[in-house]
């Protein structure tokens, strides 16, 4: 009988025994059935294997004494390995190809054949045995009969899970089938394990042979069960909670269980205290929610253990949360260790009695920065930190849960600050004691609490005493020195007591601690305590609900499962590791199927090896009309295919002629003496020196710089010269006989010196621009030359082609299914079969969409994986040749476009932006019928141009029209531009507000480290430019916005407390790795991105402190202490890093994610930015003494706006002349300060003076450096 399941989690058991000789590999596969049940397949007959490469100079098949030579190698290996020798009767001798190098040999003139190499494939019981083999063979070995030879062990880093998947062609996440029952377990069929013998808590468990597991083609949504969770913790001192402090308890844990793709949701709140439960549905202001199951516990230890028990009972396949890898999981682990209940806490996952493992993974890459993850590896459960997923896939200003929820869902959670949570906890644990009789020491005194009246010495008091533990509010509670007798001072009388009665049972109370114990045992939580706990409980549950909703909204499960299927990589590996492992697994799978060994050890990366990046054209800044974007489709993957660039096709054999190869040769000259930019810079420097000599010369006559007509050098020339002696000095070196040029100028010639000075200014600016563009890293390599075989097709090109073809086919499937769905939906009377088909298609479309996206990502990542120094399969020649061909291709396209009547306004990497002025009329009015006709004409022309140019390139390199026309396109510099988009019929792409949607790259609008105020001012300027408003209107708008920033301080009593206003001024920046909580601020020698040796703290390069500084720069001139040295290094890190350290030192919590939000304050002097920035929460708390530095925000706008003005307005001069002292903060403050000293009328008068006098001055000043017309070029 056949069964099917969706395999989602794999586990290898190699490390479950410490005895190496008894260690055996076993694999467990966890899957989900159609009806949501969990199955575990236990595979005991799989053996991990490695390849041992033998010297190719020996004929190993040749027999000696009746046995092949290779048998002697096996005998030797068995001898040296002893009990850890390979599995008997499983060793294979085989000839295979190598991944690295073409390895072609000439068999006859002009005929070459790819060479195979001899390998022993050895199977072992455990990977530990493989490590032993690797250790034994790390050096040359002396084999009897062969002498000293080198036996190289290959593919030791391949996991058994990957080996099983490629051997049986199984998806690491996907539907698989397996056979059960039949002829019984001895034949390898799956044998159902009895309940009492089961290793796991899965619904079904089978022991099965790997030979009866196979992949099946099935597209059914998987009903995976997910648990979203969150914790709430307390801090005794109000600072960021330290888990090692006993009082900082975890007092609430929310868990939301849901099934992907269904409406099922079950909410749990595990809590200390007694939260007020629901009164309305689903959540009211005071209760936890009617649909929330509240589980109450007396101690934190019980709470933590219950959290693990809940997982064991509910059996989720996935657990997820927000920032759980960096906070929640770590905090719970530390608390469990503190309470000595760690084993109970780690009892998670599907195995009955096996503990989860604490894991910490840290790695870094250029794409993702530093990744530091701490989680519990629970077998059968995938642990997903959703914040980490969002950080890697989406660029947002902030990664707080609230911000992300607003961005994706449009919803938010209750705004409950950490300190409010701490207050709620303190209130939430308060108890009161009711109906207790207090017996005094004196017999003539009776006090009864909890009744309508009190008898004291036979006197009645209508107002009863409050409960005992509150008696301090009306009387004074004191105790004797021995702390055994209590005295209550009530209305001037002192009463003593020591006995409490509860339920007619007396309890003797002698100390305060005994009373507290009594209160905890028999007291009840106050109503305010219940409300406080409920308030936090609601907040805690909301967090988990938002995580669940974001998980569903982003289709996280489908994304991971489809990427896993494409890359043959387990889901958890994809989540916690980078691109390299996915790349390696794809290559290994192909190599396994084509008898090739991934011998990456044969290639060593030169640490100094570097290569150039993509080609980017210098644009002509300005506002353009009707720009057509033409892009290469998947340029780098296509180049690898077209030029057959691969490890296996790389040619380093001179015997192979160039005719058989794709030859690529070029020079790399970057910032060296051969670089055209450097040559031009040096020429400018020489010319500037000559010009400065002329300008600074004191004599009237001097040698000129320009070539005039030739003239005879004779004394007739000097007849009318006043200063003949000066002339003679210049004539000494002139050769009269050769008629040398006489080039002497009178400096008093009108305008001559002014022209020289202008020339000096222009050349200085040009040299400055060149210097900015020059790379700081010099590269001077002549005659790079690499060759790749034209045939046969390489491994890497084949893999990429397969991925691109698969994506194309999948997208075709999507298109066909959508068409079919549309037809079905149009039917008025739908049959049951139609409804079933509609449901099936709707379920299938998201799967196919995520699948085609996984193909795209995988294909595009192939190139990057080859160009790393430390990686799975590095190979620099592929990366270098790919970027070279990319540079060459975009230059060729620009030339073809010019030949076809186009004008390239900008080019970058794989894109060209071009105008066809002869095809359309650029002056037609937007939105008219004529505009629509012109755009349709341009659209069709662009398609034809793309097809024509594509024919000039090798297959599959294709130039594509982006199906968009940028009818307004403002280009500023390289990688900085903005545009409005329209479609084929001239329909303008609009945003949610009904305005033309602005696309942008590289400018303020697209960079996350600019505040909203700056983006609004900038966008306002660009919108007006695109709307063709006048210069006056544009400049007026800029000045108005800037003045409004200051006048805001007047309009509101305390503008800094205005939430909406303050949000406009918040800056966010990313914080890289500097050591975090374990930071020592001690630099270590490492490598930068270019492979150069640099001193680093985390990811940041820092200078090394000198002995002189250490000796003299301490307090009072004394030598620096260790803390002062650390602070010295801290000051060399970016300001946002310094702010984060400052926040932590204050004991406050850091924001979630790698980005930090702050505002810039005015400290009253010119200080470092690190001294001026403050966290938003800290600023709000201290807004009475802290003020915003408005000047900072304006200064940050000057350069970007000036860049726009120079690009749009004619002859716009330098920015420092546009923005004069009228914008100086001190000048404005001199007016603002009068608000508190004079009447409102005086203030309004001064403000009017500022607006009516200062602003026109500013406008005129800007006008003097620009012409009023907008110029469309």
Swiss-Prot record:
Catalytic activity line of the entry: DNA(n) + a 2'-deoxyribonucleoside 5'-triphosphate = DNA(n+1) + diphosphate
Question: From which residue to which does any coiled coil extend?
Answer: 679-837
The Enzyme Commission number assigned here is: 2.7.7.7
Listed InterPro entries? DNA-dir_DNA_pol_B, DNA-dir_DNA_pol_B_exonuc, DNA-dir_DNA_pol_B_multi_dom, DNA/RNA_pol_sf, DNA_pol_B_thumb, DNA_pol_palm_dom_sf, DNA_pol_type-B, RNaseH-like_sf
Single GO BP term:
viral DNA genome replication
Q: What class of enzyme is it?
A: transferase
Domain of life per record: Viruses
Name of the molecule in the record: DNA polymerase 037L
Q: Identify the coding gene.
A: DPOL
């Amino acid at each position: 009988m056949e069964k099917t399941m969706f395999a989602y989690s794999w586990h290898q058991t190699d490390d479950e025994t410490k005895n190496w000789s008894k260690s055996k590999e076993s694999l467990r596969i966890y899957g989900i059935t159609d009806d949501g049940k969990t199955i575990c397949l236990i595979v005991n007959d799989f053996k991990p294997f490695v390849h041992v490469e033998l010297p190719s100079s020996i004929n190993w098949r040749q027999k000696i004494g009746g046995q092949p030579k290779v048998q002697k190698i096996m005998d030797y290996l068995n001898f040296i390995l002893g009990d850890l020798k390979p599995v008997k009767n499983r060793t294979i001798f085989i000839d295979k190809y190598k991944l690295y190098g073409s390895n072609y040999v000439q068999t006859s003139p002009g005929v070459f054949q790819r060479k195979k190499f001899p390998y022993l494939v050895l199977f072992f019981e455990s990977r530990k045995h493989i490590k032993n083999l690797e250790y034994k063979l790390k050096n040359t070995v002396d084999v009897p009969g062969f002498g000293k030879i080198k036996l190289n062990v290959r593919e030791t880093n391949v996991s058994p899970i990957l080996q099983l998947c490629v051997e049986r062609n199984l998806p690491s996440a996907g539907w698989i089938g397996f056979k059960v029952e039949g002829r019984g377990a001895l034949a390898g069929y799956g044998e159902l394990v009895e309940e009492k013998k089961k290793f796991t808590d899965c619904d079904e468990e089978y022991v099965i042979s790997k030979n009866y597991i196979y992949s099946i083609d099935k597209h059914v949504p998987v009903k995976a069960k997910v648990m979203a969770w969150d914790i709430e913790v307390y801090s005794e001192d109000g600072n960021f909670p330290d888990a090692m402090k006993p009082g900082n308890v975890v007092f609430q844990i929310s868990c939301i269980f849901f099934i992907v793709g269904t409406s099922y949701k079950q909410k749990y709140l595990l809590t200390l205290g007694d939260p007020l439960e629901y009164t309305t549905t689903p959540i009211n202001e005071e209760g936890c929610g009617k649909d929330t199951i509240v589980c109450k516990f007396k101690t934190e230890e019980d709470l933590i253990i219950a959290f693990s028990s809940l997982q064991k009972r509910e059996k989720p396949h996935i657990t997820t949360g927000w920032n759980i890898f960096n906070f929640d999981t770590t905090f719970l682990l530390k608390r469990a260790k503190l309470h000595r209940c760690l084993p109970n806490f780690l009892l998670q996952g599907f195995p009955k009695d096996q503990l989860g493992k604490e894991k910490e993974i840290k790695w870094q890459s250029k794409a993702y920065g530093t990744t530091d993850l701490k989680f519990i590896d629970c077998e059968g459960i995938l642990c997903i930190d959703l914040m980490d997923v969002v950080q890697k896939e989406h660029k947002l200003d902030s990664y707080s849960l609230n911000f992300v929820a607003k961005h994706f869902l449009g919803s938010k959670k209750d705004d409950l600050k950490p300190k409010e949570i701490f207050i709620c906890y303190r209130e939430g644990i308060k108890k009161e004691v009711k109906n207790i009789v207090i017996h005094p020491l004196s017999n003539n005194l009776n006090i009864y609490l909890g009744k309508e009246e009190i008898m004291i010495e036979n006197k009645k008091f209508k107002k009863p005493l409050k409960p005992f533990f509150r008696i301090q509010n009306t009387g004074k509670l004191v105790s004797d020195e021995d702390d055994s007798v209590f005295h209550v001072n009530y209305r001037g009388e002192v009463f003593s007591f020591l006995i409490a009665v509860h339920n007619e049972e007396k309890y003797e109370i002698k100390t305060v601690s005994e009373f507290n114990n009594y209160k905890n045992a028999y007291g009840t939580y106050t109503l305010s305590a219940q409300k406080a706990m409920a308030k936090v409980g609601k907040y805690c549950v909301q967090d988990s609900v938002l995580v669940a909703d974001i998980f569903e909204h982003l289709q996280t499960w489908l994304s991971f499962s489809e990427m896993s299927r494409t890359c043959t990589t387990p889901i958890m590996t994809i989540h916690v590791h980078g691109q390299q492992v996915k790349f390696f697994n794809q290559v290994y799978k192909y190599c396994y199927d084509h008898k090739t060994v991934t011998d990456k050890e044969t290639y060593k990366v030169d640490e100094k090896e570097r290569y150039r990046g993509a080609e980017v054209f210098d644009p002509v800044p300005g506002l353009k009309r009707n720009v057509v974007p033409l892009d290469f489709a998947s340029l780098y993957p296509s180049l690898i295919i077209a030029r057959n660039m691969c490890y296996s096709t790389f040619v380093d054999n001179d015997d192979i002629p160039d005719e058989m190869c794709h030859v690529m040769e070029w020079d790399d000259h970057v910032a060296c003496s051969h670089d055209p930019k450097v040559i031009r810079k040096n020429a400018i420097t020489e010319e500037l020196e000559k010009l400065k000599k002329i300008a600074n010369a004191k004599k009237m006559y001097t040698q000129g710089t320009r070539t005039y007509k030739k003239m005879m050098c004779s004394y007739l020339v000097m007849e009318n010269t006043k200063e003949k002696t000066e002339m003679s000095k210049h004539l000494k070196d002139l050769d009269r006989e050769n008629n040398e040029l006489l080039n002497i100028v009178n400096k008093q010639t009108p305008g001559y010196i002014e022209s020289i000075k202008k020339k000096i200014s222009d050349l200085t600016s040009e040299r400055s621009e060149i210097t900015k563009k020059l790379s700081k890293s010099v590269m001077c390599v002549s005659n790079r030359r690499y060759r790749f075989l034209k045939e046969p097709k390489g491994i890497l090109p084949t893999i990429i082609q397969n991925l691109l073809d698969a994506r194309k086919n999948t997208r075709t499937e999507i298109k066909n299914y959508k068409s079919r769905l549309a037809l079905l939906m149009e039917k008025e009377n739908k049959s049951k079969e139609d409804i079933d088909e509609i449901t099936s298609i709707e379920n299938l479309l998201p799967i196919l969409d995520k699948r085609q996206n996984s193909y795209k990502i995988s294909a595009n990542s192939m190139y990057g994986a080859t160009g790393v120094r430390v990686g799975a399969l590095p190979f620099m020649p592929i990366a270098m040749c790919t970027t070279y061909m990319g540079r060459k291709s975009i230059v060729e396209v620009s030339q073809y476009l010019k030949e076809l009547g186009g004008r390239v306004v900008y080019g970058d990497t794989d894109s060209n932006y071009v105008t066809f002025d002869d095809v359309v009329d650029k002056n037609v009015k937007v939105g008219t019928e004529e505009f629509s006709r012109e755009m349709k004409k341009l659209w069709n022309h662009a398609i034809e141009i793309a097809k024509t140019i594509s024919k000039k390139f090798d297959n599959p390199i294709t130039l594509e029209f982006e199906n968009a026309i940028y009818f307004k396109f403002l280009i500023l510099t390289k990688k900085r531009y903005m545009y409005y988009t329209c479609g084929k019929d001239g329909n303008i792409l609009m945003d949610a507000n009904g305005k033309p949607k602005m696309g942008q790259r590289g400018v303020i609008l697209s960079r996350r480290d600019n505040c909203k105020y700056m983006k609004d001012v900038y966008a306002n300027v660009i919108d007006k430019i695109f709307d063709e408003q006048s210069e006056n209107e544009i400049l007026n708008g800029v000045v108005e916005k800037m003045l409004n920033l200051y006048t805001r301080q007047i309009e509101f009593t305390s503008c800094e407390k205005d939430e909406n206003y303050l949000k406009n001024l918040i800056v966010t920046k990313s914080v890289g790795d500097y050591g975090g909580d374990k930071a020592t601020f001690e630099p270590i020698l490492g490598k930068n991105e270019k492979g150069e040796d640099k001193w680093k703290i985390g990811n940041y390069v820092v200078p090394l402190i000198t002995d002189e500084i250490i000796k003299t720069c301490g307090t009072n001139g004394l030598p620096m202490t260790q803390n002062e040295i650390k602070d010295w290094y801290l000051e060399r890190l970016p300001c946002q890093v310094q702010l984060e350290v400052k926040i932590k030192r204050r004991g406050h919590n850091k924001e979630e994610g790698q980005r930090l939000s702050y505002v810039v304050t005015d400290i009253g002097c010119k200080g470092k930015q690190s001294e001026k920035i403050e966290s938003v929460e800290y600023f709000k708390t201290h807004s009475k003494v802290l003020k915003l530095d408005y000047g900072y925000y304006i200064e940050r706008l000057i350069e970007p706006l000036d860049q726009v003005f120079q690009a749009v307005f004619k002859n716009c001069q330098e920015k420092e002349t546009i923005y004069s002292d009228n914008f100086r903060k001190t000048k404005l403050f001199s007016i603002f300060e009068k608000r508190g000293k004079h009447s409102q009328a005086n203030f309004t008068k001064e403000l009017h003076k500022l607006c009516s006098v200062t602003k026109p001055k500013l406008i005129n000043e800007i006008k003097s450096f620009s012409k009023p017309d907008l110029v469309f070029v």
